[in-house]
């Protein structure tokens, strides 16, 4: 039975815990196993939200081991209809600079061995992913960042690689031909949200130029810039959440219409 606790879910890193000084933990069991951690229900700027740390509270789950199906299902069980994913990404363009924010509008799946669907049979659905992100939330997140004077790009193609390793230089140069940013955690999170007719948008914070640049990607450097970006992401969320209404005027809720075979 669905327990209506929050209509907005946030999936991201542990740096967001201080947004909710008081929260209630919900341990959710799903048909797909355990989520990354307990879901924290709390209030952010007057809005009830459900927060789930994608890699676990202590960041012990690598990107290719995240149980994306359980995470999305758990939020859905709590009554969440809109999800904001928080992602650290590398830049594949010189004009998309470390420290800046991207609100992506397209993605490319370059993962290899993840559970990609809720519908493995006997029910079969083929959802459209022509426009995978919620236009309503994308617009709110972009406008909020602009109003806060945070450097932000309102479009971008996000390529998701399997991880946990970073790209080779040859791979990175290839990816530059058809994507703008690169990361390890968007897919299948975004398409699974679509399979449950949920709204989904991403705040992607650029931590580095990918290895196509002259300097190789360094995990420690990425973490340092991530910490610097945390306050920008928190500011965007704090100001954007009250603008995201429960009533959905987008078409995300219709994603399953005519999708069943």
UniProtKB/Swiss-Prot annotation:
PROSITE patterns noted in UniProt: PNP_MTAP_2
Pfam family, one: PNP_UDP_1
Gene3D superfamilies: Nucleoside phosphorylase domain
GO CC terms, sorted: cytosol
The protein's annotated pathway: Amino-acid biosynthesis; L-methionine biosynthesis via salvage pathway; S-methyl-5-thio-alpha-D-ribose 1-phosphate from S-methyl-5'-thioadenosine (phosphorylase route): step 1/1
The keyword Glycosyltransferase is annotated on this UniProt entry: yes
Enzyme Commission code: 2.4.2.28
A biological process term (GO) from this entry: purine ribonucleoside salvage
One example GO MF annotation: S-methyl-5-thioadenosine phosphorylase activity
Record key words, sorted: Glycosyltransferase, Purine salvage, Transferase
Enzyme class: transferase
Residues that coordinate or bind phosphate: 14, 54-55, 185
CDD domains in alphabetical order: MTAP_SsMTAPII_like_MTIP
Residues at the site labelled Important for substrate specificity: 167, 219
Reaction equations catalysed: S-methyl-5'-thioadenosine + phosphate = 5-(methylsulfanyl)-alpha-D-ribose 1-phosphate + adenine
Residues that, per the record, bind substrate: 184, 208-210
Entries under HAMAP family matching the protein: MTAP (MF_01963)
Family membership: Belongs to the PNP/MTAP phosphorylase family. MTAP subfamily.
Function: Catalyzes the reversible phosphorylation of S-methyl-5'-thioadenosine (MTA) to adenine and 5-methylthioribose-1-phosphate. Involved in the breakdown of MTA, a major by-product of polyamine biosynthesis. Responsible for the first step in the methionine salvage pathway after MTA has been generated from S-adenosylmethionine. Has broad substrate specificity with 6-aminopurine nucleosides as preferred substrates.
Self-association state and partner proteins as the record states: Homohexamer. Dimer of a homotrimer.
Protein name: S-methyl-5'-thioadenosine phosphorylase
Gene (UniProt): mtnP
């Amino acid at each position: 039975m669905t327990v209506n606790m929050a209509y907005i879910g946030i999936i991201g890193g542990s740096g967001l815990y201080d947004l909710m000084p008081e929260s209630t933990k919900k341990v959710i069991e799903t048909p797909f196993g355990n989520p990354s951690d307990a879901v924290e229900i709390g209030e952010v700027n007057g809005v009830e939200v459900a927060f789930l740390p994608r890699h676990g509270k202590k960041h012990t789950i690598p990107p290719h081991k995240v149980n994306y199906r359980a995470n999305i299902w758990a939020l859905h069980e709590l009554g969440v209809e809109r999800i904001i994913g928080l992602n650290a990404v590398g830049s594949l363009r010189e004009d998309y600079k470390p420290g800046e924010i991207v609100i992506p509008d397209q993605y490319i799946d370059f993962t290899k061995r993840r559970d990609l669907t809720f519908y493995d049979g006997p029910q079969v659905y083929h959802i459209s992913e022509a426009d995978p992100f919620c236009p309503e939330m994308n617009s709110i997140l972009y406008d909020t960042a602009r109003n806060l004077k945070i450097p932000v790009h309102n479009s971008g193609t996000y390529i998701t690689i399997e991880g946990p390793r970073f790209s080779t230089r040859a791979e990175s140069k290839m990816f530059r031909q058809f994507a703008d940013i690169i990361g390890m955690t968007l897919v299948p999170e975004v398409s699974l949200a679509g399979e449950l007719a949920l709204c989904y948008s991403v705040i992607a914070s650029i931590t580095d130029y990918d290895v196509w640049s002259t300097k190789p990607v360094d995990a420690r450097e990425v973490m340092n810039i991530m910490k610097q970006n945390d306050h920008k992401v928190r500011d965007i969320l704090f100001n954007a959440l009250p603008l995201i209404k429960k009533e959905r005027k987008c078409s995300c809720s219709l994603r399953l219409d005519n999708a069943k075979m």
